[in-house]
A protein has these predicted regions:
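Gly/Ser-rich catalytic serine loop of serine hydrolases
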Residues: 93-99
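Amphipathic alpha-helical interaction surfaces in cytosolic regulatory modules
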Residues: 53-66
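Conserved CoA-thioester-binding segment of acyl-CoA-metabolizing enzymes
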Residues: 1-51, 71, 75-78
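N-terminal glycine-rich phosphate-binding loop for ADP-containing cofactors
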Residues: 1-4, 15, 27-29, 67-72, ...
Length: 445
């Protein structure tokens, strides 16, 4: 982090390459500086910008479970908001997650025309942890806040200006513009504009209509965290700000411990750590394209799923029942394309376990053959290539969700019916560990 005082303006530049992530070290440094600034009488405004091409890209997903380590991002944001002088955030590049929450804590927000802002935590099963659910509705109302929070879609600078999320778009360099604006605020003795004290968005007569609409449209959404977001945005209009922050923190902790979020974060890491020979991106569409080795893995996984579905049908399960279970589990469609039927809880459990057992069993054999080094690589391929539901993190993790020891015992009973349920040696090995298949790493030939 870089810091200096110029003509009464404390100039803070976040410097944590390559994207100014809010690491624990940066939070400690920023926390200490904010404590000092609160006591200085020679500082009349504060400018916060980022080094390089982006303001701040938030927190590394792999460090989310350490986000509450002191000083927490929530504490940092509260200290920024409570400073006795105007604080201006100068935004550029793709501002993500904690970077957006940092900006919301400032009293003013400026952005370059090419800047985009996004809060994509919902896609990871997480609630935004540092005040976004309480500050954002105060600025833009419930409808816009929920759209930003639930969709995770980037908001352009122009859209942000129209909604009230930012105060202005600059045409020159953001650092110079932010400093100039700070000097303007000092000259005109402009008052503080703490978002916590704003009520414009909360006074929207359609605020609670937006809440009700969001509940209606997400009632069948598989991501459980979306209900927590809606509750938190509703709380913003019903509770004092500080109590609202406590409400948000409780839901943040709930989302952090949710197995669905754990699965989604694991998958996020797996997708970003796939070996280069397994996945590339199409130059034009930017879509992920599986390489030859990943395609070989995919063919084997698909084959095991097909055999399991066909075997269950041959043994008397209806096509509609099998498809209903697959769709309810999260697949876009069933194997047979049949009309889904009502399925008893007992039958639902068995169909699910037979499907996951077959696919994960083949995954174990893929590990044995050295075609993949890690179970997470197999899971990423399954999600990318065969539409395996993201919130289950792939078949190898899904086996752990069911219980590998339990699933292995079931497969030992089923393997007489078809080799697709043969228990692989790697499943015996995975059953020894709490982390299941994730505890196993093999050398690829």
């Amino acid at each position: 982090m870089k810091f200096r005082v110029r003509d009464g303006v404390a100039v803070i530049v976040l410097a944590s390459p390559p994207v100014n992530a809010l690491t624990h070290a940066l939070r400690v440094e920023l926390d200490h500086l904010l404590d000092q600034l609160a006591l200085r009488d020679d500082v009349m405004a504060v400018s916060i910008t980022g080094e390089g091409d982006t303001f701040c890209a938030g927190v590394d997903v792999r460090q989310m479970d350490k986000l509450d380590d002191a000083p927490s991002l929530r504490t940092i944001c509260q200290k920024i908001e409570n400073l006795p002088v105007p604080v201006i955030a100068g935004l550029r590049g793709m501002v993500l997650s904690g970077g957006v929450e940092l900006a919301l804590a400032a009293h003013y927000r400026l952005a370059e025309a090419s800047c985009k802002l996004a809060l994509p935590e919902a896609s990871l099963g997480l609630l935004s942890p540092a005040g976004a659910t309480q500050r954002l509705p105060r600025l833009v109302g419930a409808a816009s806040a929920l759209d930003i929070l639930l969709s995770g879609r980037p908001v352009t600078a122009e859209q942000a200006k129209l909604s009230g999320l930012i105060d202005g778009i600059v045409t020159g360099g953001i650092r110079a513009a932010t400093l100039q604006f700070a000097e303007h605020l000092i000259t005109h003795k402009s008052p503080l504009r703490r978002v916590r004290d704003m009520t414009k968005g909360l006074r929207d007569p359609k605020y609670f209509d937006a809440i009700a609409k969001a509940r209606k449209t997400t009632e069948r959404d598989p991501l459980r965290v979306k209900a927590l977001y809606i509750d938190a945005v509703e709380a913003a209009a019903m509770l004092p700000f500080d109590i609202g922050l406590e409400f948000e923190e409780e839901r943040w902790q709930q989302s952090l411990a949710d197995p669905q979020s754990i699965a989604l974060r694991r998958l996020f890491a797996a997708e970003h750590q796939l070996p280069a020979d397994m996945v590339t991106r199409d130059a034009e569409t930017r879509r992920r394209v599986l390489g030859p080795k990943a395609q070989d893995i995919l063919k084997r996984l698909r084959r095991s799923q097909v055999i399991a579905a066909e075997m269950m049908f041959a043994m008397g399960r209806s096509k509609g029942a099998i498809d209903a279970v697959m769709i309810d589990y999260g697949f876009a469609q069933g194997h047979f394309g049949a009309e889904p039927e009502q399925v008893s809880p007992q039958d639902r459990t068995e169909i699910t376990e037979r499907l996951i057992g077959a696919i994960a069993g083949e995954g174990g054999r893929i590990l044995q053959d050295g075609l993949a080094r890690r179970a997470a690589d197999i899971d990423a391929v399954a999600v990318i290539g065969m539409g395996f539901p993201r919130w289950h993190s792939g078949p190898m993790h899904a086996a752990r969700e069911i219980g590998i020891v339990h699933l292995r015992e079931k497969m030992r009973d089923w393997q007489v019916e078809s080799p697709v349920w043969t228990v692989p040696r790697m499943m015996d090995e995975a059953a020894k560990y709490l982390m299941g298949f994730d505890a196993i790493s093999v050398q690829r030939p």
